[in-house]
Protein backbone atom coordinates (compact mmCIF):
# COMPACT_ATOMS: atom_id res chain seq x y z
CA UNK A 1 0.00 0.00 0.00
CA UNK A 2 1.18 3.52 -0.72
CA UNK A 3 3.23 5.35 1.88
CA UNK A 4 1.28 8.59 1.41
CA UNK A 5 -2.08 6.93 2.03
CA UNK A 6 -0.74 5.23 5.15
CA UNK A 7 0.69 8.47 6.48
CA UNK A 8 -2.58 10.30 5.91
CA UNK A 9 -4.61 7.51 7.51
CA UNK A 10 -2.43 7.44 10.62
CA UNK A 11 -2.51 11.24 10.85
CA UNK A 12 -6.32 11.32 10.68
CA UNK A 13 -6.70 8.49 13.18
CA UNK A 14 -4.12 9.35 15.82
CA UNK A 15 -3.57 13.12 15.87
CA UNK A 16 -4.80 14.46 19.23
CA UNK A 17 -7.43 17.18 19.41
CA UNK A 18 -5.02 19.37 21.38
CA UNK A 19 -2.61 19.62 18.45
CA UNK A 20 -5.22 21.22 16.19
CA UNK A 21 -4.56 25.00 16.19
CA UNK A 22 -7.23 27.00 18.01
CA UNK A 23 -7.90 29.07 14.91
CA UNK A 24 -8.61 25.93 12.90
CA UNK A 25 -11.00 24.68 15.57
CA UNK A 26 -12.85 27.99 15.60
CA UNK A 27 -13.12 28.04 11.82
CA UNK A 28 -14.32 24.44 11.77
CA UNK A 29 -17.20 25.44 14.04
CA UNK A 30 -18.28 27.99 11.42
CA UNK A 31 -18.05 25.33 8.73
CA UNK A 32 -20.19 23.00 10.83
CA UNK A 33 -22.84 25.63 11.52
CA UNK A 34 -22.94 26.85 7.93
CA UNK A 35 -23.26 23.30 6.60
CA UNK A 36 -25.93 22.37 9.11
CA UNK A 37 -27.93 25.42 8.04
CA UNK A 38 -27.62 24.40 4.41
CA UNK A 39 -28.80 20.87 5.26
CA UNK A 40 -31.85 22.23 7.07
CA UNK A 41 -32.67 24.58 4.19
CA UNK A 42 -32.31 21.81 1.65
CA UNK A 43 -34.46 19.40 3.62
CA UNK A 44 -37.67 21.05 2.38
CA UNK A 45 -36.88 20.63 -1.31
CA UNK A 46 -39.64 18.55 -2.89
CA UNK A 47 -37.46 15.69 -4.11
CA UNK A 48 -35.54 15.59 -0.82
CA UNK A 49 -38.76 15.34 1.17
CA UNK A 50 -39.98 12.63 -1.18
CA UNK A 51 -36.84 10.54 -0.77
CA UNK A 52 -36.97 11.03 3.00
CA UNK A 53 -40.57 9.83 3.20
CA UNK A 54 -39.74 6.67 1.28
CA UNK A 55 -36.49 5.79 3.05
CA UNK A 56 -37.76 6.40 6.58
CA UNK A 57 -41.01 4.48 6.04
CA UNK A 58 -39.40 1.18 7.03
CA UNK A 59 -38.18 2.47 10.37
CA UNK A 60 -34.68 2.43 11.79
CA UNK A 61 -33.11 4.15 14.76
CA UNK A 62 -29.92 5.71 15.98
CA UNK A 63 -29.54 9.01 14.16
CA UNK A 64 -31.52 12.17 13.47
CA UNK A 65 -32.53 13.38 10.04
CA UNK A 66 -32.20 17.18 10.07
CA UNK A 67 -35.59 17.98 8.61
CA UNK A 68 -39.06 19.08 9.76
CA UNK A 69 -40.24 16.81 12.56
CA UNK A 70 -36.70 15.57 13.28
CA UNK A 71 -37.33 11.99 12.12
CA UNK A 72 -34.93 9.25 13.19
CA UNK A 73 -33.54 6.36 11.20
CA UNK A 74 -30.39 4.26 11.05
CA UNK A 75 -27.06 6.15 10.83
CA UNK A 76 -26.34 5.22 7.21
CA UNK A 77 -29.73 6.35 5.93
CA UNK A 78 -29.64 9.50 8.08
CA UNK A 79 -26.24 10.41 6.66
CA UNK A 80 -27.50 9.82 3.12
CA UNK A 81 -30.61 11.95 3.63
CA UNK A 82 -28.76 14.79 5.33
CA UNK A 83 -26.08 14.78 2.64
CA UNK A 84 -28.70 14.80 -0.11
CA UNK A 85 -30.43 17.75 1.53
CA UNK A 86 -27.19 19.68 1.87
CA UNK A 87 -26.27 19.21 -1.77
CA UNK A 88 -29.71 20.10 -3.10
CA UNK A 89 -29.57 23.90 -2.96
CA UNK A 90 -26.00 24.70 -4.10
CA UNK A 91 -25.13 26.66 -0.96
CA UNK A 92 -22.65 24.19 0.52
CA UNK A 93 -19.12 25.44 1.11
CA UNK A 94 -16.14 24.36 -0.96
CA UNK A 95 -12.36 24.29 -1.04
CA UNK A 96 -10.54 27.19 -2.66
CA UNK A 97 -7.84 25.16 -4.36
CA UNK A 98 -9.26 21.66 -4.85
CA UNK A 99 -12.53 20.51 -6.41
CA UNK A 100 -13.99 19.39 -3.11
CA UNK A 101 -17.25 20.25 -1.38
CA UNK A 102 -16.00 18.44 1.67
CA UNK A 103 -18.11 19.55 4.61
CA UNK A 104 -21.51 18.66 3.19
CA UNK A 105 -20.28 15.15 2.38
CA UNK A 106 -18.28 14.60 5.59
CA UNK A 107 -20.51 16.21 8.22
CA UNK A 108 -23.56 13.93 7.69
CA UNK A 109 -21.40 10.91 8.56
CA UNK A 110 -19.92 12.72 11.54
CA UNK A 111 -23.31 13.75 12.92
CA UNK A 112 -24.98 10.37 12.40
CA UNK A 113 -22.06 8.32 13.71
CA UNK A 114 -21.48 10.59 16.69
CA UNK A 115 -25.12 10.41 17.71
CA UNK A 116 -25.24 6.63 17.37
CA UNK A 117 -21.94 6.15 19.22
CA UNK A 118 -22.72 8.84 21.83
CA UNK A 119 -19.60 10.87 21.09
CA UNK A 120 -18.95 14.39 22.36
CA UNK A 121 -19.18 17.63 20.44
CA UNK A 122 -15.39 17.87 20.48
CA UNK A 123 -15.06 14.40 18.98
CA UNK A 124 -17.63 15.26 16.34
CA UNK A 125 -15.82 18.45 15.38
CA UNK A 126 -12.51 16.58 15.22
CA UNK A 127 -14.11 14.04 12.88
CA UNK A 128 -15.22 16.87 10.60
CA UNK A 129 -11.74 18.43 10.63
CA UNK A 130 -9.89 15.21 9.86
CA UNK A 131 -12.50 13.99 7.40
CA UNK A 132 -12.19 17.27 5.54
CA UNK A 133 -8.42 16.88 5.61
CA UNK A 134 -8.63 13.48 3.96
CA UNK A 135 -11.19 14.65 1.40
CA UNK A 136 -9.21 17.69 0.28
CA UNK A 137 -5.83 15.96 0.24
CA UNK A 138 -7.05 12.98 -1.75
CA UNK A 139 -8.84 15.43 -4.03
CA UNK A 140 -5.54 17.25 -4.55
CA UNK A 141 -3.89 13.99 -5.54
CA UNK A 142 -6.67 12.98 -7.92
CA UNK A 143 -6.49 14.00 -11.57
CA UNK A 144 -10.16 14.16 -12.43
CA UNK A 145 -11.52 13.14 -15.80
CA UNK A 146 -12.80 16.09 -17.89
CA UNK A 147 -16.51 15.95 -17.01
CA UNK A 148 -16.24 14.14 -13.67
CA UNK A 149 -17.93 15.75 -10.67
CA UNK A 150 -16.40 15.44 -7.21
CA UNK A 151 -19.61 14.24 -5.53
CA UNK A 152 -19.01 10.75 -4.19
CA UNK A 153 -15.31 10.68 -5.03
CA UNK A 154 -12.54 12.11 -2.78
CA UNK A 155 -15.09 13.58 -0.32
CA UNK A 156 -16.61 10.11 0.06
CA UNK A 157 -13.31 8.90 1.48
CA UNK A 158 -13.25 11.96 3.72
CA UNK A 159 -16.57 10.80 5.11
CA UNK A 160 -15.11 7.34 5.67
CA UNK A 161 -12.26 8.93 7.62
CA UNK A 162 -14.74 10.82 9.80
CA UNK A 163 -16.65 7.63 10.51
CA UNK A 164 -13.44 5.78 11.33
CA UNK A 165 -12.23 8.54 13.63
CA UNK A 166 -15.46 8.43 15.63
CA UNK A 167 -15.10 4.68 15.98
CA UNK A 168 -11.64 5.19 17.53
CA UNK A 169 -10.04 3.13 14.80
CA UNK A 170 -6.26 2.82 14.63
CA UNK A 171 -4.27 4.13 11.70
CA UNK A 172 -4.13 0.65 10.18
CA UNK A 173 -7.87 0.21 10.62
CA UNK A 174 -8.57 3.62 9.09
CA UNK A 175 -6.35 2.75 6.15
CA UNK A 176 -8.39 -0.41 5.63
CA UNK A 177 -11.67 1.50 5.87
CA UNK A 178 -10.44 4.03 3.31
CA UNK A 179 -9.34 1.29 0.93
CA UNK A 180 -12.71 -0.41 1.30
CA UNK A 181 -14.31 2.95 0.62
CA UNK A 182 -12.36 3.20 -2.63
CA UNK A 183 -14.55 0.41 -4.03
CA UNK A 184 -17.62 2.53 -3.30
CA UNK A 185 -16.64 5.76 -5.09
CA UNK A 186 -19.10 6.99 -7.71
CA UNK A 187 -18.97 8.35 -11.25
CA UNK A 188 -21.25 11.43 -11.46
CA UNK A 189 -20.67 13.92 -14.25
CA UNK A 190 -20.99 17.71 -14.45
CA UNK A 191 -23.43 17.10 -17.30
CA UNK A 192 -26.01 16.27 -14.64
CA UNK A 193 -25.95 19.90 -13.53
CA UNK A 194 -26.40 21.19 -17.07
CA UNK A 195 -29.28 18.78 -17.63
CA UNK A 196 -30.97 19.69 -14.34
CA UNK A 197 -30.54 16.13 -13.11
CA UNK A 198 -30.84 16.20 -9.33
CA UNK A 199 -29.44 12.67 -9.22
CA UNK A 200 -26.09 14.45 -8.92
CA UNK A 201 -27.06 15.39 -5.37
CA UNK A 202 -27.72 11.76 -4.50
CA UNK A 203 -24.06 11.05 -5.25
CA UNK A 204 -23.14 13.61 -2.61
CA UNK A 205 -25.52 12.00 -0.15
CA UNK A 206 -24.02 8.60 -0.82
CA UNK A 207 -20.74 9.89 0.60
CA UNK A 208 -22.45 10.04 3.97
CA UNK A 209 -23.86 6.54 3.56
CA UNK A 210 -20.44 5.13 2.64
CA UNK A 211 -18.83 7.03 5.48
CA UNK A 212 -21.03 5.23 7.98
CA UNK A 213 -20.74 1.89 6.18
CA UNK A 214 -17.07 1.39 5.27
CA UNK A 215 -15.70 1.59 8.84
CA UNK A 216 -18.19 -1.07 9.92
CA UNK A 217 -17.10 -3.27 7.02
CA UNK A 218 -13.49 -2.87 8.11
CA UNK A 219 -14.29 -3.74 11.71
CA UNK A 220 -16.26 -6.77 10.51
CA UNK A 221 -13.22 -8.20 8.75
CA UNK A 222 -13.75 -7.24 5.11
CA UNK A 223 -10.42 -7.14 3.24
CA UNK A 224 -9.27 -4.59 0.67
CA UNK A 225 -6.43 -4.57 -1.82
CA UNK A 226 -3.34 -2.56 -0.82
CA UNK A 227 -3.47 -0.09 -3.72
CA UNK A 228 -7.25 0.33 -3.88
CA UNK A 229 -7.18 4.14 -3.65
CA UNK A 230 -4.33 4.61 -6.09
CA UNK A 231 -6.04 2.29 -8.57
CA UNK A 232 -9.48 3.86 -8.20
CA UNK A 233 -8.26 7.44 -8.56
CA UNK A 234 -5.43 6.77 -10.97
CA UNK A 235 -7.09 4.37 -13.42
CA UNK A 236 -10.83 3.98 -12.80
CA UNK A 237 -12.80 7.07 -11.75
CA UNK A 238 -9.76 9.35 -12.17
CA UNK A 239 -7.09 9.84 -14.81
CA UNK A 240 -4.04 9.92 -12.54
CA UNK A 241 -2.99 10.13 -8.91
CA UNK A 242 -0.14 12.20 -7.44
CA UNK A 243 0.73 10.68 -4.08
CA UNK A 244 3.05 13.55 -3.19
CA UNK A 245 0.10 15.96 -3.03
CA UNK A 246 -1.55 13.89 -0.30
CA UNK A 247 1.04 14.65 2.39
CA UNK A 248 2.21 18.11 1.36
CA UNK A 249 2.60 20.17 4.58
CA UNK A 250 0.57 17.55 6.45
CA UNK A 251 0.07 18.70 10.03
CA UNK A 252 1.07 22.26 9.19
CA UNK A 253 -1.54 23.24 6.61
CA UNK A 254 -5.12 22.52 7.63
CA UNK A 255 -7.44 22.12 4.66
CA UNK A 256 -10.68 23.09 6.38
CA UNK A 257 -9.16 26.53 6.96
CA UNK A 258 -8.72 26.94 3.19
CA UNK A 259 -12.41 26.72 2.37
CA UNK A 260 -14.85 29.32 1.12
CA UNK A 261 -18.48 29.90 2.04
CA UNK A 262 -21.12 30.30 -0.62
CA UNK A 263 -23.21 33.44 -0.55
CA UNK A 264 -24.90 32.56 -3.83
CA UNK A 265 -26.41 29.29 -5.00
CA UNK A 266 -23.67 28.52 -7.51
CA UNK A 267 -20.05 27.45 -7.77
CA UNK A 268 -17.46 30.08 -6.87
CA UNK A 269 -15.98 30.59 -10.40
CA UNK A 270 -19.26 32.30 -11.34
CA UNK A 271 -19.17 34.75 -8.43
CA UNK A 272 -16.99 37.37 -10.14
CA UNK A 273 -19.32 37.52 -13.13
CA UNK A 274 -22.37 37.86 -10.88
CA UNK A 275 -20.66 40.58 -8.84
CA UNK A 276 -19.92 42.48 -12.05
CA UNK A 277 -23.49 42.03 -13.27
CA UNK A 278 -24.85 43.39 -9.99
CA UNK A 279 -22.66 46.47 -10.29
CA UNK A 280 -23.71 47.02 -13.90
CA UNK A 281 -27.40 46.71 -13.04
CA UNK A 282 -26.97 49.11 -10.13
CA UNK A 283 -25.37 51.67 -12.43
CA UNK A 284 -28.11 51.26 -15.04
CA UNK A 285 -30.82 51.78 -12.42
CA UNK A 286 -29.31 55.12 -11.44
CA UNK A 287 -29.06 56.45 -14.99
Label for each model-derived stretch:
Residues 249-287:
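A conserved active-site cap/scaffold subdomain adjacent to cofactor or substrate pockets
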Residues 1-257:
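N-terminal core-entry segment
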Amino acid sequence: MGKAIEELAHFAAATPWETIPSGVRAHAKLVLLDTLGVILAGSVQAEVAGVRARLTATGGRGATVYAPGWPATDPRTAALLNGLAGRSIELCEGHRYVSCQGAVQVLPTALASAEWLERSGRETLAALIFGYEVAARLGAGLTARPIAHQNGQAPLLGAVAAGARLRSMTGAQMSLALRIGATLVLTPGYTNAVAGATALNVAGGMSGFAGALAPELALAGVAAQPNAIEEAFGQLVGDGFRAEAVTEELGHRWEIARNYFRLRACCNPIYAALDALEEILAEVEHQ
